[in-house]
Amino acid sequence: MSEPIRVLVTGAAGQIAYSLLYSIGNGSVFGKDQPIILVLLDITPMMGVLDGVLMELQDCALPLLKDVIATDKEDVAFKDLDVAILVGSMPRREGMERKDLLKANVKIFKSQGAALDKYAKKSVKVIVVGNPANTNCLTASKSAPSIPKENFSCLTRLDHNRAKAQIALKLGVTANDVKNVIIWGNHSSTQYPDVNHAKVKLQGKEVGVYEALKDDSWLKGEFVTTVQQRGAAVIKARKLSSAMSAAKAICDHVRDIWFGTPEGEFVSMGVISDGNSYGVPDDLLYSFPVVIKNKTWKFVEGLPINDFSREKMDLTAKELTEEKESAFEFLSSA
């Protein structure tokens, strides 16, 4: 057995965490021979609920779970971390302006970034899930200057999986038969799900998705909007936001960071845009296609970008630039 790793989940009393914690504890993310110390952070009013989650994790009697720590204190939560999964954020309330939401979250992620900087290992991998995820991730990274910015990523894997699922449903195959879809940009309704480079396995042969579907207007229209608005559709139907699918996407994202991406496959994650070859401005936290090896991601380079894609990629970059500018205003005054 190897040494235990310390894994933090914030927003640990919430519903995404409730769907996530068992998978982390049972070895589905870090492997079946990796012991784990699981640290659960939430705000003080949620500590009663968090105690219940702690009891349940104990009652799962998971062999890999060496210890579970529930806390509302950042200095306890962020100490010596190997992995931080930042799920907790201020949710958008009815009638709340996006600006107010951004301001509340800048405060949270500035504080958590500073705690990472002060207490966590410098090699910590930080995954931001709480919305607005891209800008929250950038805020945390800027507030943790001693941790390499490449160690920060935000979740767009849920959008990636949603795109795969839509293509699979349309073609009557399983999602596993679809690979190399891309989510470009922000985890918002301006994201651009791109299948120009995606492949699907049909009768044992790999075929381009455009070629397989022969329905360009669906791919450029309804497919894009369905993926962009899927989160809202789930809320409308379930009266709660996606939790099971979000937790599964977090597991996929973190497992790929830990073990690498399969040969010939790439995935989508929000990462720092510095040095990309796709004309996205530097210093944005933008979702790109990446491959991962030895716990290090690299951009997938050299994919041809058509005019339709270019326009969509620029639009979401513009939104991220505006979000970043507002956040940085709050950051300097926070």
Curated annotation (Swiss-Prot):
Its EC number is 1.1.1.37, 1.1.1.96. NAD(+) binds at G11, A12, A13, G14, Q15, I16, A17, D42, N105, Q112, V129, G130, N131. GO terms for cellular component: centrosome; cytoplasm; cytosol; extracellular exosome; extracellular space. InterPro entries: L-lactate/malate_DH, Lactate/malate_DH_C, Lactate/malate_DH_N, Lactate_DH/Glyco_Ohase_4_C, Malate_DH_AS, Malate_DH_NAD-dep_euk, Malate_DH_type2, NAD(P)-bd_dom_sf. The active site is at H187. Pfam families: Ldh_1_C, Ldh_1_N. It is linked to Developmental and epileptic encephalopathy 88: A form of epileptic encephalopathy, a heterogeneous group of early-onset epilepsies characterized by refractory seizures, neurodevelopmental impairment, and poor prognosis. Development is normal prior to seizure onset, after which cognitive and motor delays become apparent. DEE88 is an autosomal recessive severe form characterized by global developmental delay, epilepsy, and progressive microcephaly. This is Malate dehydrogenase, cytoplasmic. The gene is MDH1.
